């Protein structure tokens, strides 16, 4: 093809592509994206420069969104048609929508007739659009008459909701992203913002570059990448946040750093709070929190003296049995110093999901009603009943997330309908969750992805649309509503979540002979219009908004009442709060330790949190191989002191055991926490790490976590558990890795899942970039049955005469290698795995192996002489490894090392998520071998 012809083809191809604006479906920052499609598939994605949440930036996850929508993966992962089974233990079979929904309506009607409306429950998700949320809420509370509807936002945001309501009067974050640019002090607590909200963190970095006087304090049990960037780092002990905030307020009182005029004019309850915090002296608080008095006093002074202090916080405060108190204590500090209701200041809760805010707006929690109304308020119930055209709304709060599954296990709830969430991965005490799902008379799962752990328990699977196919609205952390438009049509027989709920509701109404429908909607816009009307006169009034305004003027913040020309950036600038008195309320917050104390049997504080390039249970990010390159396999991170005390080296397997369950994991050395603490990424469920356990399998990180919850917010303490860690003596081990056709990738993972439960320990992850591969690892007390090993190898194509084989049965070692086109295609090692590192790198680098000759099969760990390990990938966007970064630093003569790396290797110049880690590597001493050279 000539150059001119190729150019013409490219122009025609570009013409065939269309671009539409949408929103990223990951965290609560709510980044705008521009999606490129050829009409059949998503072919690219980039940040929307006009969206006020991100101004064109995307993180590693957002910039690879299009890769999650590849047709080859969609065909393997997506639920594309309804499925049902009538006998547990059998496979589900394909069914029509009519047959499926008729069956569900009849079962619900029969169960409700026999046991009452509270015998059914709905567990929904912060990944639903607001319209989906609204319809399900109305279905449960309005049509069926049960408040047993809760959302996975209970696991992440309900303590923030309760904290805002107790102190400020409404669940309304008072600050906005612009306040990052205007702050004099940023106080980050309970959040690794650099990982969890990376685009917001880019804004923090920019603000600090523009204003060198801007200070940043970080309080966290771990020295995260966020903490390493801080001007002052407070390495508090797990769960001591309330003591820290009370101690800071004590110092502000002692040093006259409170704003008494604001307190007198706009708050109430301060005298009682003073009596609470008077005992939180610097000495007591420093000892409680495990920090120095000097740092505590410095933090309090910076906060109290600042013209504008902005607090950013997330799950470290919320996921706690005292999460509401943590939120309230921090808000107390803001109120007392008048760090609220003005530019650059305020307590700003960062949401973890793309529409957790939207779910709160429609009353998606079991104790709330539409438009921030309270279920316990008779007037609020009457208002909702009038809006919906029903006699009344049930007055008794429904079961919260943990309570719902406990009731399911006890038999009080007979049917559960799970929508767009994966409780068999994300809920605490997985043993109880699975017992509940097995005990249920009927489990309905409404999902886009059939690969989640929860889908294994589904008696009925309802296929739903997902990102790029949905239409509606989402609300991000700063109260900004974005219109979400479909980029592609619905695949297969999928329906929008609200459509499924409405079709079911119409059938139930017919069975109950209702004279008129509560669900007369023909479009998502009609649903949203009713939601909009529910907000009239409320703190989140959006009666001035419409789909048309969102379409023409772009994303808008609430409140946006009728007659307004714009939303409100920040709240309470007039000092008036949505309470009965119009004043904010100080709440007494005595410190309570973690729910589960460490002791001689369980001496470690286990914390959980996010990895940089993964999200939640990984049903979406887990389909993109390159997102595994930064943290390639499940692991528990321990301090160097604890590794040495237990005679552990990196990669050694350990039993991690709590009072509820156990999981074997590789141990890694970390320099980000003190002795006696451990960390596991929250994402690792049984889809990626498992084992035989007691015969029923092991369930990943949340086999360990506690279901104990905050009495006000009902949010469980997922952030902390007491565990013991013992070396796992598993003498037999195996690893298999190889390239897999993309059309078989996820199917292979699913096929390997049952095999994982046959070993004491097993994990299965992806690797690669342009090509994708699967890595399967296992270990056991004894050598695995040869038939099982052969079966696993055959799934990687390691079978037949073309396989190179070395077997030493006496020592239990084997090396089986599949070569194609002169390059490694797949490798299986058992027994001695010491050659894994270089064999895998040869495979990933697609290097010719002819010159290696016998070395391929020699029982040695030594790599070829010219081999050089790339090490871990640091910059995912541009595929830059730690070794390459350290080599460049070794040759650097001086000056700005970060600028040099960005210019020479381009790392940190795309999404910027790796910049905090680049700074960490720059500051760290070079490896000894490099220094010696």
Label each PLM-derived region with a short phrase.
Residues 86-93, 255-293, 370-371, 375-382, ...:
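N-terminal leader/propeptide and maturation segments of large enzyme subunits in energy/redox metabolism
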Residues 1-257, 265, 269, 273, ...:
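N-terminal export/assembly segments and adjacent metallocofactor-ligating motifs
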Residues 760-856:
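C-terminal catalytic lobe of FAD-dependent flavoproteins
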Residues 12-22, 40-57, 861-872, 891-910:
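Immediate flanking context of iron-sulfur cluster ligation sites
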Residues 599-621, 797, 861-900:
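C-terminal accessory/binding modules appended to enzymatic or scaffolding proteins
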Residues 491, 497-553, 621-637, 641-797, ...:
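Long, contiguous, secondary-structure-rich segments that constitute the structural scaffold
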Residues 21-33, 55-65, 871-884, 903-923:
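Local cysteine-cluster metal-coordination motifs and their immediate loop/turn environment
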Residues 134-205, 212-217, 242-246, 334-457, ...:
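Extended redox/cofactor-interaction regions of prokaryotic respiratory oxidoreductases
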């Amino acid at each position: 093809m000539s150059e001119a012809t190729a150019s013409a083809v490219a122009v025609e191809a570009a013409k065939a592509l269309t671009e539409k604006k949408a929103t990223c479906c990951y965290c609560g920052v709510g980044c705008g994206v521009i999606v490129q499609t050829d009409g059949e598939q998503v072919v690219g994605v980039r940040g929307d420069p006009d969206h006020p949440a991100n101004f064109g930036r995307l993180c590693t996850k957002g910039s690879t969104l299009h890769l999650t929508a590849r047709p080859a993966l969609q065909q393997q992962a997506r639920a594309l048609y309804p499925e049902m089974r009538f006998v547990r233990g059998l496979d589900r079979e394909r069914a029509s929508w009519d047959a499926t929904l008729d069956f569900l309506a009849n079962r619900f009607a029969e169960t409700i007739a026999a046991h009452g409306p509270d015998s059914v429950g709905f567990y929904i998700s912060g990944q639903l659009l607001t319209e989906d949320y609204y319809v399900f809420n109305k279905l449960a509370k309005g049509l069926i008459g049960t408040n047993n509807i809760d959302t996975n936002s209970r696991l992440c945001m309900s303590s923030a909701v309760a904290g805002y309501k107790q102190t400020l009067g409404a669940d309304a974050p008072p600050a906005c992203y612009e306040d990052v640019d205007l702050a004099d002090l940023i106080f980050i607590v309970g959040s690794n913002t650099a990982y969890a909200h990376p685009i917001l963190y880019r804004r923090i970095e920019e603000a600090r570059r523009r204003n060198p006087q801007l200070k940043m304090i970080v309080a966290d049990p771990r020295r995260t990448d966020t903490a390493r960037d801080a001007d002052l780092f407070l390495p508090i002990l797990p769960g001591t946040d309330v003591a820290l905030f009370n101690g800071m307020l004590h110092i502000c009182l002692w040093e006259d750093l409170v704003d008494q005029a604001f307190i007198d004019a706009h708050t109430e309850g301060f005298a009682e709070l003073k009596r609470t915090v008077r005992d939180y002296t610097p000495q007591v608080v420093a000892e409680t929190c495990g920090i120095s008095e000097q740092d505590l006093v410095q933090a309090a002074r910076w906060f109290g003296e600042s013209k504008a202090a902005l607090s950013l916080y997330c799950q470290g405060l919320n996921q706690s049995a005292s999460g509401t108190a943590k939120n309230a204590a921090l808000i107390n500090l803001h109120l007392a110093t008048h760090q609220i209701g003005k530019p650059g200041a305020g307590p700003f809760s960062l949401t973890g999901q793309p529409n957790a805010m939207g779910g709160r707006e429609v009353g998606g929690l079991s104790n709330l009603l539409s438009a921030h109304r309270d279920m316990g308020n008779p007037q609020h119930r009457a208002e909702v009943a009038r809006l919906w055209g029903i006699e009344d709304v049930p007055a008794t709060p429904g079961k919260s997330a943990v309570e719902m599954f406990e009731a399911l296990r006890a038999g009080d709830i007979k049917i559960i309908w799970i929508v767009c969430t994966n409780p068999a991965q994300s809920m605490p005490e997985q043993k109880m969750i699975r017992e509940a799902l097995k005990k249920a008379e009927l489990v309905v799962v409404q999902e886009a992805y059939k690969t989640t752990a929860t889908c294994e328990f589904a008696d009925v699977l309802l296929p739903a649309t997902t990102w790029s196919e949905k239409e509606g609205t989402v609300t991000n952390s700063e109260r900004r509503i974005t219109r979400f438009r479909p980029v592609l049509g619905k695949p297969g027989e999928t329906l929008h979540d609200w459509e499924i709920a409405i079709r079911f509701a119409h059938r139930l109404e017919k069975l109950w002979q209702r004279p008129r429908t509560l669900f007369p909607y023909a479009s998502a816009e009609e649903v949203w219009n009713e939601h909009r009307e529910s907000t009239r006169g409320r703190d989140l009034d959006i009666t001035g908004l419409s789909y048309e305004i969102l379409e023409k003027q772009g994303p808008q913040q609430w409140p946006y009442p009728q007659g307004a020309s714009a939303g409100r950036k920040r709240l309470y600038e007039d000092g008036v709060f949505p309470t009965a008195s119009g004043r904010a309320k100080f709440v007494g917050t005595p410190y309570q330790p973690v729910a589960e104390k460490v002791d001689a049997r369980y001496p470690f504080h286990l914390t959980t949190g996010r990895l940089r390039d993964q999200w939640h249970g990984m049903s979406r990010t887990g389909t993109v191989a390159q997102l595994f390159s930064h943290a390639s396999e499940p692991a528990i991170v321990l301090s160097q002191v604890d590794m040495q005390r237990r005679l552990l080296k990196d990669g050694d397997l350990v039993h991690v055991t709590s009072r509820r369950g156990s999981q074997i994991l590789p141990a890694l050395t970390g320099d980000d926490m003190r002795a006696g603490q451990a960390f596991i990424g929250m994402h690792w469920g049984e889809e990626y790490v498992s084992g035989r356990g007691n015969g029923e399998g092991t369930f990943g990180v949340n086999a360990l976590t506690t279901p104990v919850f905050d009495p006000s917010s009902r949010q469980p303490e997922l952030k902390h558990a007491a565990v013991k860690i013992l070396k796992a003596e598993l003498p037999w081990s195996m690893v298999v890795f190889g390239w897999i056709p993309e059309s078989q990738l996820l199917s292979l993972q699913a096929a390997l899942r049952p095999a994982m439960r046959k070993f004491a320990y097993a994990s299965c992850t992806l690797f690669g970039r342009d090509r994708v591969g699967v890595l399967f690892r296992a270990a056991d007390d004894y050598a695995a049955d040869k038939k099982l090993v052969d079966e696993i190898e055959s799934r990687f194509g390691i079978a037949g005469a073309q396989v190179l084989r070395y077997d030493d049965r006496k020592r239990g070692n084997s090396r089986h290698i599949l070569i194609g086109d002169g390059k490694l295609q797949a490798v299986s090692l058992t027994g001695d795995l010491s050659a894994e590192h270089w064999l895998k790198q040869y495979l990933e680098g697609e290097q010719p192996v002819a010159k290696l000759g016998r070395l391929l099969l020699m029982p040695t760990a030594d790599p070829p002489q010219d081999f050089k390990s790339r090490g871990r990938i640091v910059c995912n966007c541009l595929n830059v490894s730690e070794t390459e970064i350290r080599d460049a630093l070794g040759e650097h003569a001086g000056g700005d090392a970060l600028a040099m790396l960005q210019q020479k290797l381009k790392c940190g110049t795309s999404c910027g998520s790796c910049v905090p880690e680049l700074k960490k590597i720059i500051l760290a001493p070079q490896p000894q071998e490099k220094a010696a050279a």
